[in-house]
A protein has these predicted regions:
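Beta-strand-centric surfaces of beta-sandwich/beta-rich domains
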Residues: 1-269
Length: 269
């Protein structure tokens, strides 16, 4: 269990077959959050026990080591992509530059970037004005459209951190999202500013090990506001509004807070 921000976070799976009851002593704490998954009817899972099976102890230690190390840029759980596209580009102001065009069926397993940055103001401008745009399989609209800094999980400017899928190291920014496609992936950089920017991008990909049909495309969009909710939902704020099937993988929320300190604890719905 990690201790930080005046709390503890435990990610150890606690399986149960029929029910799970959680109790706490009086004055135990002031805040808690439990995340659980309900499996389809008929699924069999082992009941949790504090006595770990001998073969599970080293596996648990391996996960602990990886999480404690914050990964640091290497995609885990996938073999390294056999193909790497490296591009160094100068993107003039108010222009779009084609970075790479990949033929499918493949999946992108990592995107890494290096951007020369100046002072704090220059960082904030460059990483918000440069946008990553990716279009899969000839679709009419890009599936990925996001300022470069926000795509790698940092705003405003550069804020050093590392986690499982995104972050930054001395070598630059990294994002290890898996992005499958059937026929074609077009990767572009858009400069919404008026100053030319130099960017180095590395795109790692590998062939699909099964047909693309049914996989779905990776989507990443940035916005300040979406459709307003009815008055009885105030002050809720919409992070995502979409239709169809898919999986929600995560969100990077950047708050311009004019009132000083803020816990950042949300009531996500």
């Amino acid at each position: 269990a990690e201790h930080g921000c005046r709390g503890q976070n435990l990610y150890l799976p606690i399986p149960y077959q029929k029910s799970c009851k959680i109790v706490a002593e009086k004055d135990w704490g002031r805040y808690y959050q439990f995340v659980y998954t309900t499996y389809p009817a008929g699924t069999k899972v082992p009941t949790f026990s504090t006595e770990l099976a001998a073969e599970n102890a080293p596996r648990l230690q391996q996960v602990n080591d990886r999480c404690a190390g914050r990964i640091g840029g290497k995609a885990e759980g996938l073999p390294p992509g056999p193909d790497v596209e490296r591009t160094a580009a100068r993107v003039d102001g108010e222009t779009t530059v084609r970075i790479a065009e990949l033929a499918g069926p493949r999946m992108i397993t990592s995107i890494q970037a290096r951007v020369p940055l100046g002072d704090r103001d220059d960082q904030m401008a460059a990483l918000r004005q440069l946008c990553l745009q990716i279009t899969f399989d000839g679709e009419a609209q890009p599936a990925v459209w996001c300022p470069l800094g926000d795509f790698f999980g940092t705003a405003p400017g550069r804020n050093d951190y590392t986690n499982w899928v995104t972050g930054m190291t001395e070598d630059g920014f990294y994002a290890n999202w898996v992005m499958p496609f059937g026929k074609r992936a077009l990767v572009e950089l858009v400069n919404d500013g008026n100053r030319a920017r130099d960017v180095e991008l590395k795109i790692v990909s590998r062939p699909l090990d099964r047909p693309f049909a049914g996989m779905g495309h990776f989507h990443c969009k940035w916005h300040r506001d979406t459709d307003q909710l009815p008055e009885d939902r105030w002050p809720d704020w919409v992070m995502l509004k979409t239709e169809g099937r898919g999986r929600f993988l995560g969100v990077m929320l950047h708050v311009w807070n004019p009132r000083g300190g803020w816990w950042g604890e949300g009531d996500e719905k």
